[in-house]
Amino acid sequence: MAPDITIYRSSFESVERQPNKPLFELPDGRTVSYRDTADTVHRIAARLLEDGVAPGDRVAMQVPKSPEAIALYLATLQVGGVFLPLNTAYTGAEMRYFLDDAQPRVLVCAPDRRDDYDAEQRGLVVETLGESGDGTLLHSQDRSDAVVDVGFDDPAAILYTSGTTGRSKGAVLTHGNLAANCAALLQAWQYTSEDRLIHALPIFHIHGLFVAANMTLVAGASMHYLSKFDTDVIIDLLPHATVLMGVPTFYTRLLRSERLASDSCSAMRLFVSGSAPLLASDHEAFAARTGHAILERYGMTETGMNTTNPYDGGIRKPGTVGKPLPGIEIRIVDRETGEPMADGEVGIVEVRGPNVFAGYWQMPEKTASEFRSDGFFITGDLGQIDDDGYLCIVGRDKDLVISGGYNIYPKEIEELLDSHPKVLESAVIGVPHPEFGETVVAVVVPNSGEQLRERELQDFVARDLARFKQPRAVRVVEALPRNVMGKVQKAELRTRYADLFVGADA
């Protein structure tokens, strides 16, 4: 869907339509209206201009989640800046890398971290913003409502990828990317000003900011705005909300609560899950408990959202991420030749549409290598299209295990392991092997109170897997390493078990 108005201007149309409507509903009972938010945006815009921010300058943010942080995002767009949200967990060398690479004009950080960044040496203006709106950013009462006229091809934000395979890359998202993706999601999920979203996601990530917040701002909806996920708080809010956007760990935690029931979900119309795969068993258990089928979608930092299971007019299939959003094309190609593959065959997922980013910040060669000549972006995800046209993500291409010349897809083994009654979850990786190049290792978390033995699990999967796919080793752990969005960090596991077969007999 081609955009016709930017996120900033759409958001301020919402302000004009309903200035007194609550945009943020906070845990302490306070509300912040659209008018109040607009006033904060204009105060921050004046401060950014005073700090010397010109169109195209980067404004970095590493602050606790607050309504003022969303206002900072909008103020950056207002003055023509490029918004750079950074994970609040980053420290030391990580932050130095992002600041040196993006070279922001302004960094807004938590008050207690003001002196952490060698600001003078970098020519960096440092402002502070705390969780309660305190800090230097809002010291002045000056306001600016002047809006820089930007084009849809102009950069709006830079989001850094997780960098699990080397140097973290800054994905440049344009005003057109953000607006087009938001418009497609509003249509697909029928999100309107009547919705009340439970927002418990971080706002330095595409899901929490460019999906949840953008949709709410543009639709003129309201959100219960939480600093973090808390099972009891979420369940208390369900009768007063219509939509929850989350990650799989949200739903596994909700399922552990005896308080989760269909009665508490009577006002809800939509539960969305993404950023990591949702177990089919959790999908089914949630539907049985609440009467709601979770809607899974597929997106990534470079593209925003690409596909979605249907809101209506079709079934939501566990283990799939649905069909392309309006205006977006998806295809599956051979990982070696790049030739299109038939439905049902596993290959690389490629995407084309107005949602696809402009490129990687200051990495023209890397950008060129990630696009086909016809404009399709090579996602690096492995997937297949089923008989109904639904996309199923099999895993990351970098997670593919090649053992003795055979391609092994970890998800197939993980699904089998997860079906064992004593297993809570699993992650399958490839590690170096002297004879086969790589071999399969399974890392497994047992259900509470259960004891698991390696041989027990190896025997269990042997009934349904060819010998070359069977884990040569199983390691039982208390928990899998995850990032803040709940994705299992397989690179960390590969490092941890890299020497498992060093010196083994070939």
Language-model segments: residues:
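Conserved AMP-binding/adenylation subdomain of ANL enzymes
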Residues: 179-196, 204-243, 257-259
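ANL superfamily adenylate-forming
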Residues: 112-152, 167, 258
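AMP-binding/adenylate-forming catalytic core of the ANL superfamily
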Residues: 90, 107, 353, 358-359, ...
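AMP-binding/adenylate-forming core of the ANL superfamily
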Residues: 331, 343-357, 376, 382-383
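Conserved structural elements of the adenylate-forming
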Residues: 37-46, 152, 171-192, 200-204, ...
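Conserved AMP-binding/adenylate-forming core of the ANL superfamily
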Residues: 20-66, 70-74, 91-96
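Conserved pre-ATP/AMP-binding loop-to-beta segment of ANL
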Residues: 19-20, 142-160, 166-167, 190-196
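Gly/Ser/Thr-rich phosphate-binding loop
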Residues: 241-246, 255-316, 329
